[in-house]
Amino acid sequence: MRTGTCRRARIVSVPTDAAHFRTPALPHSPLSDPFGRAPDDGSVFSPHIEFSRAEWARLRGSTPLTLSHDDLEALHSAEEHVSMDEVMEVYLPLSRLLNLYVAATQQLFRVTDTFLGSPAAKVPYVVAIAGSVAGGKSTTARILQALLARWPDHPKVDLVTTDGFLFPNAVLEERGIMHRKGFPESYDVRRLIRFLAEVKSGSEEVRAPVYSHLVYDIIPGELVVRRPDILILEGLNVLQTGGTAGERPPRVFVSDFFDFSIYIDACEADLEGWYLQRFQRLRETAFRDPESFFHQYAVGMSEQEAMEFGRQVWATINAVNLRENIEPSRERARLILDKAKDHRVERVWLRKL
């Protein structure tokens, strides 16, 4: 991974041409330990295999490109323009891998059915996407949803974000943690676990609450999930396992329900830059809506004042959450996408089974 001014924990990995050999121990980052376990002899065993972009792109095989330029335009965000090359070299190999994993899981279900002598209810394959604010989780989720749904067997792919499982603002205000919105304690984790438990039990319909970024709160209505083949769950802290402060650690974790997990990784300085770009764009667009929770930052502040506020939000909320909760969970991901300053994925880490 990049070093120098790039502030993030370092990934220790095994090169693709030496996947079963030890790699030299690397210095620990001040943010978190390197991946793998350090044996007594000072070397490191890594659970991840590292791929350069070119190496990963070759794993596409003969997977056809099923997205048009118009399709792609509708999927990426204003801050993150994803090129067709990015889709072909990064996301097509990933969709191929996921398709193989889903097929293998379905075969395992058939074997179990044969053993039990009776068919079981179809259980969705759950893919989790984690990472920092402004890291590109939503764009990755939408692109994967579109690619997976276009496979020859046309699986049904649903997308749910954990924003809907935030406590309503009234609850956050009552508990005095409105300033901690996005931190683990601001989520109704029990409700999220119940939702995933129902999904994985094969329930016909499972309902999730709806969150509005315009009003910055939970709104009336429900998102109904009806037994998809694949469910993509996108959120900041989905890979975390620790309990919140003052609470007993849960016996069941959100990640217990995942079949595959992806972490979007980037330098903290780049993440901050992307966040401020997004803040500026929203100030010029959505924040101008009188119904917007952040309307005051579009009309009641100068540009300099608003951007200073954005930098303060990053430093006191988003960066703290990244260092304390989000980045430490990275090593639990099955696959890590390492982004450069221009949002291009430069390297990929895949956990060995």
PLM feature segments, named:
Residues 126-132, 158-162, 261:
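Extended hydrophobic secondary-structure segments that form protein cores and membrane-embedded regions
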Residues 79-86, 158-160, 165-215:
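Conserved nucleotide-sensing/catalytic segment adjacent to the nucleotide-binding pocket
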Residues 18-21, 29, 34-35, 40-62, ...:
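Conserved NTP phosphate-binding and transfer environment spanning the P-loop NTPase/kinase superfamily
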